[in-house]
């Protein structure tokens, strides 16, 4: 499967792969608090400081589960791949933003054709939300994925029931 944007105007795409992972493959990882830049911008937008803006992640600085290599086989036209498992806990809000990939660009020496692929590891649950380029998404199935170009605004939240995290795999890569 290749990641393709139908035209130069397309900013994102959606697709599906059949899940080949189990809950144990990602739920038992040693997730840590994800700290990322951007808080001042969100405070300036009027979001109060008590909001939880970040969930938990398990990234490339840790040993990756064995099944992760299959994603590079499935998405055959990407390179410089990094993986981050993300656990968005209940009452986490990630306001609309653009990822600048500063560290990724530095590490891989690239500036263009950077994409994000978000693989939904579980079926959608009420209160889970994703927005890409001003379009909202709910009701996804495990294996659904969303890919977008690096300059595309996106947002996410988990305002669902307590103890009902949203698990995703974030793939950052260069489109070949």
Predicted segments with their positions:
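A structural detector for beta-sheet-dominated domains
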Residues: 6, 88-89, 133
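A general structural signal for short secondary-structure junctions and capping/turn motifs
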Residues: 73-77, 107-111, 138-139, 159-161
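Tight coil/turn sites that cap or link beta-strands
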Residues: 90-92, 143
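Residues at beta-strand starts and edge strands
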Residues: 11, 113-115, 163-167
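A short beta-loop-beta micro-motif enriched in histidine and acidic residues
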Residues: 80-81, 96-116
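Catalytic core of Fe(II)/2-oxoglutarate
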Residues: 123-176
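Short, conserved beta-strand element in jelly-roll/cupin
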Residues: 87-89, 106-126, 172
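Non-heme Fe(II)/2-oxoglutarate
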Residues: 1-85
């Amino acid at each position: 499967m290749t990641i393709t944007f139908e035209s130069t105007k397309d900013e994102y795409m959606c697709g599906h792969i059949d899940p080949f992972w189990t809950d144990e493959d990602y739920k038992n990882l040693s997730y840590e608090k994800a700290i990322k830049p951007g808080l001042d911008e969100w405070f300036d937008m009027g979001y109060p400081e008590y909001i939880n803006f970040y969930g938990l992640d398990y990234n490339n600085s840790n040993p990756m589960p064995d099944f992760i290599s299959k994603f590079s086989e499935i998405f055959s036209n990407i390179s410089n791949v990094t993986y981050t498992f993300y656990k968005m806990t209940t009452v986490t809000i990630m306001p609309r933003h653009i990822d600048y990939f500063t560290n990724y660009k530095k590490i891989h020496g690239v500036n263009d054709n950077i994409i994000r692929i978000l693989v939904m590891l579980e079926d959608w649950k009420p209160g889970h939300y994703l927005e890409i380029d001003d379009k909202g998404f709910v009701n996804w199935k495990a294996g659904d994925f969303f890919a977008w170009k690096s300059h595309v605004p996106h947002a996410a939240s988990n305002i669902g029931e307590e103890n009902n995290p949203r698990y995703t795999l974030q793939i950052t890569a260069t489109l070949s």
